[in-house]
Every structure is written in structure tokens, then in C-alpha cells.
């Protein structure tokens, strides 16, 4: 499931009757603690959950910006919960390998959120702050690759990232 943190619970709840016993559900949301709890609270008996987070992405979303190589050589964090079965975790690991991820890590949802706060969330905040502090009188002629690289992720989906920041505010 790929959606915003606030939407995932509703998606699972609406579709829970479609999940067959033995199914494995995963998400690729950028925050794990609250999403994992939310998903597990509405999963039917006999359906397993294992969280996942591919460490790849773009500042532009949508089908037109899709790339078959997005996950190639990327990291992938698998975030099982206490009830996740070993074989389900292995299935998610195999899926991560299949899409091209090579650095696969297992972490608790809490550990994931703690580290991602620094390695991703803070970087998005810093990029946005840099863009907002850009003097209007400054001409783009004064910028080059380093400015572009530092500010690339500031072109984010504001609704999605507001939810991610709020969900990982601890």
C-alpha cells in the first residue's frame, strides 16, 4: 500500500473483507510506528502485516514521473511488528530484492522512525528552509549544482509531507 499515513487505515478498513487468510499486507509509507499500529488494528484474523520502506524516491510523483530503475541499488527497510511471521518477512525481503534493492535492513517501526527523522525528515525541512530563505533579489545566475542538489527535495507534496512530519514528530 502506498498512500499517505492518514489514508492507509481507511484503505485497509474498507478493503479488509477482500483479504484472504494467509495474505501478507505491506505498506511503503515513510513513517512506521503509527501506520503499523493503525494497520494492525483493522487487519482481519489470519492476515499478516510487515511494514516496508524503500529508500528511494523522487520529488515529483505521479505516473508520468515513474521510473523502472527507481529502486535499483537502493536501500529497503523492513519493519516487522511482533506478530509478523518469519516467512512473511522473507517474502518482503524477496520483493525488495526483486525491485532492485540491495541494502536491506530489518528494524522495528520505532527504530525506523527515530533514524528517518534525521536521515530524511530533517533533510526535507532543511531544504525547504533554504528555499524559503532564498533572497528574492538574488538572481538564479548565482546558483549552480550545489544549490540545486540541496534544494531538490523541497519540491515535495506538501499534504503528504505534513502528514509524515506530524506522524514522526516524537
How would you label these PLM feature ranges?
Residues 13-64:
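Rossmann-like NAD(P)(H) cofactor-binding subdomain of soluble oxidoreductases
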Residues 64-70, 163:
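Short, flexible, solvent-exposed loop/turn segments with mixed acidic/basic and small polar residues
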Residues 1:
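Conserved small/polar residues in nucleotide/adenosyl-binding loops
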Residues 8, 12:
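Aromatic/hydrophobic pocket-lining residues that form the small-molecule binding cavity
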Residues 155-170:
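NAD(P)-dependent Rossmann-like dehydrogenase/reductase catalytic/cofactor-binding core
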Residues 68-153:
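Internal alpha-helical scaffold of NAD(P)-dependent oxidoreductase catalytic cores
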Amino acid at each position: 500500500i502506498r498512500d499517505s499515513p492518514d489514508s492507509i487505515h481507511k484503505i485497509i478498513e474498507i478493503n479488509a473483507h477482500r483479504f484472504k487468510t494467509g495474505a501478507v499486507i505491506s505498506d511503503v509509507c515513510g513513517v512506521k510506528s503509527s501506520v503499523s499500529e493503525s494497520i494492525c488494528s483493522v487487519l482481519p484474523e489470519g492476515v499478516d502485516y510487515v511494514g516496508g520502506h524503500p529508500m528511494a524516491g523522487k520529488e515529483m510523483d505521479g505516473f508520468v514521473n515513474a521510473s523502472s530503475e527507481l529502486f535499483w541499488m537502493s536501500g529497503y527497510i523492513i519493519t516487522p511488528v511482533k506478530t509478523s511471521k518469519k516467512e512473511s518477512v522473507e517474502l518482503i525481503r524477496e520483493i525488495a530484492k526483486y525491485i532492485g534493492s540491495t541494502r536491506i535492513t530489518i528494524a522495528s517501526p520505532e527504530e525506523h522512525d527515530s533514524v528517518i527523522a534525521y536521515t530524511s525528515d530533517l533533510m526535507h525541512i532543511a531544504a525547504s528552509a533554504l528555499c524559503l530563505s532564498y533572497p528574492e533579489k538574488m538572481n538564479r545566475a548565482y546558483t549552480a549544482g550545489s544549490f540545486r542538489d540541496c534544494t531538490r527535495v523541497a519540491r515535495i507534496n506538501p499534504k503528504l509531507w505534513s502528514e509524515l512530519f506530524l506522524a514522526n514528530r516524537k
